[in-house]
Amino acid sequence: MTLNRRTFLGTAAAASATLAAPMVKAQGTPRVVVIGGGAGGATAARYIAKDSKGEVGVTLIEPTRTYYTCFFSNLYIGGFKEMNDLGHSYGGLASNGVNVVHDWAVGVDRDAKTVALAGGGSVPYDKLILSPGIDFVDGSVPGWSLAAQNAMPHAYKAGSQTELLKAQLESMPQGGTFAMVAPPNPYRCPPGPYERVSMVAHYLKENNPTAKIIVADPKPK
């Protein structure tokens, strides 16, 4: 093929565009996506956005609009705090420059570097932080299921479970029995069960003084 001026310029332009593409991406704003808006995910999103001074685009994907802290939730059971005291909105993160997407992350394409959303669409990223927290696996404990948590609330995740547990305490008959099972080691918050039963004891002392408390604990100490 004869390389005339028009062909040469066209080929040169295409080559320039190909070489320039990585540079354009490198010069663009880096994108960090955080999945999970609990204490870990929200803290990571906040400080990346804050410390980068807007030079990093941060997106937080979290389905709920209010995060209720499990820490201090025992004070609600004991009557020292209101439920609203445990709730935190995501407005503060937005004011720090975090793009908050209230949806479920349902998949990650590691090759395309995108996070699929339950509501449709996807969010692109350059770096991804996974901080979804913990949850129960249905059927993992013999004799217990996710449906049973409505009758026997664990309140390991603050929010509706915490409210249900307190409502059950309030509806206990005078002289009734409160039973709690402490988990075996290892688990996430070692003092948690004992903080909780102490707050339950305080509540019952004030409101149901003849009630009994039974703690089943598999740990020797």
Regions found by a protein language model. Name each.
Residues 1-15:
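N-terminal secretory signal peptides and thylakoid transit peptides that target proteins
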Residues 119-127:
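Core beta-strand elements of the Rossmann-like FAD/NAD(P) dinucleotide-binding domain
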Residues 27-99, 184-221:
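Beta1-alpha1 glycine-rich phosphate/pyrophosphate-binding loop at the start
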Residues 132-208:
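Glycine-rich dinucleotide-binding loop and its adjacent helix/turn
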Residues 103-112:
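A conserved short coil-to-beta-strand element within the FAD-binding core of flavoproteins
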Residues 11, 131-132:
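Short, well-ordered coil/turn residues at beta-beta hairpins
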